[in-house]
Amino acid sequence: MEVDLLHFEKKYHNYIVAGIDEAGRGPLAGPVVASAVIIDNANIIHGIKDSKKLSKKKRALLYEQITSNYVWAVAIITHTEIDKINILEATKKACSIAAANLNVKPEIVLVDGNMQFSDERFISIVNGDNLSLSIAAASIIAKVTRDRLMLELSAKFPQYLWHKNSGYGTKEHLEAINKYGLSPYHRKSFKCC
């Protein structure tokens, strides 16, 4: 049975609905990025789904379509702030800022995951990137934005292979940490670091 990715958008059809997702909670280096997207129900872009289920090429194509056709915003919380406030609080902060950065104020904010927010407009949906088109669109924007940032950082610190691992704790990345030590962009509050 195919999931109706517009279920939540239809449920709240009388409201301006934004979807939010993040990229970068688990990596050992780099920022966490959240994106907020308000889709246009009259202009549905086909092929949008959870960014993890798309090829890099397809994500890039959909990124261009989403950013050209929908209201969207991003928020970036640095590795330094993650170390200060922890990854959960950094993720929640990024989500709140992304929603606030939209040039249209959402009345309902659908967020992937099970995080709790004090703002009652925020509704957390476990597995939301597979259940809501606006969250899935946000997952694409967040993932592409973060991957591009890590590609830029990889040019400065090529030994960590961030252009391939996006800062995640792959075998090669851990070996590079052991050999070269931490870069200025590693999260020092994470176990390996």
Curated annotation (Swiss-Prot):
Enzyme class, spelled out: hydrolase
Keyword set, alphabetical order: Cytoplasm, Endonuclease, Hydrolase, Manganese, Metal-binding, Nuclease
InterPro entries: RNase_HII, RNase_HII/HIII, RNase_HII/HIII_dom, RNaseH-like_sf, RNaseH_sf
Cofactor(s) demanded: Mn(2+); Mg(2+)
Binding sites annotated in the UniProt record for a divalent metal cation: 21-22, 112
GO biological process: DNA replication, removal of RNA primer; mismatch repair
Name used for this protein in its record: Ribonuclease HII
Name of the gene encoding the protein in the UniProt record: rnhB
